[in-house]
């Protein structure tokens, strides 16, 4: 009961309601995380639904964050879900992290990943980072900045600079 109460008191922000964000949010809601914020500015398309498990054919054309919020509330009534139909920017990301216990990045661009990592380090918010390319997936936990353990590491400790955009295929080209 004590651990369940801690989960219910937690606030997790998820960047991206796509192939990574959908199963992550479903698991967070199912385990009883009490407050979930999802940030995405895309709509559901037919090409999404085979891998984005919160969506179905009737959702095509609807905002991903709205559909995701509905599904999560159906799965776990009583949780709070904030649907933010926006793209995170330098201007809004730090405010978005206020009161957040964990940031989960399921975005599909290095610009967003580095923005999230920098904001997580500035705010001291633990960052769970995921990426996928074809049949390969990567996950990492980054935690540095205020309140982090002394031996914590941020993403820029391993990846100091963003890759050249031309050196990395986009999702459509890479078969994601």
Regions found by a protein language model. Name each.
Residues 1-176:
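Adenine nucleotide-associated cytosolic modules
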């Amino acid at each position: 009961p004590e651990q369940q109460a801690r989960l219910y008191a937690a606030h997790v922000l998820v960047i991206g309601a796509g192939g990574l964000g959908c199963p992550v949010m479903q698991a967070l809601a199912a385990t009883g995380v009490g407050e979930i914020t999802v940030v995405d500015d895309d709509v559901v398309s037919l090409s999404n639904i085979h891998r984005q498990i919160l969506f179905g054919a009737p959702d095509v054309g609807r905002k991903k964050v709205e559909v995701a919020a509905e599904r999560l509330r159906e799965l776990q009534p009583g949780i709070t879900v904030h649907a933010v139909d926006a793209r995170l920017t330098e201007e809004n990301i730090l405010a978005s992290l206020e009161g957040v216990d964990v940031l989960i990045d399921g975005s599909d661009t290095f610009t967003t990943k580095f923005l999230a990592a920098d904001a997580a380090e500035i705010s001291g918010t633990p960052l769970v980072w995921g990426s996928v390319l074809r049949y390969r997936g990567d996950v990492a936990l980054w935690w540095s900045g205020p309140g982090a353990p002394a031996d914590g590491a941020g993403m820029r400790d391993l990846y100091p600079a963003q890759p050249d955009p031309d050196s990395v295929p986009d999702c459509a080209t890479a078969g994601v």
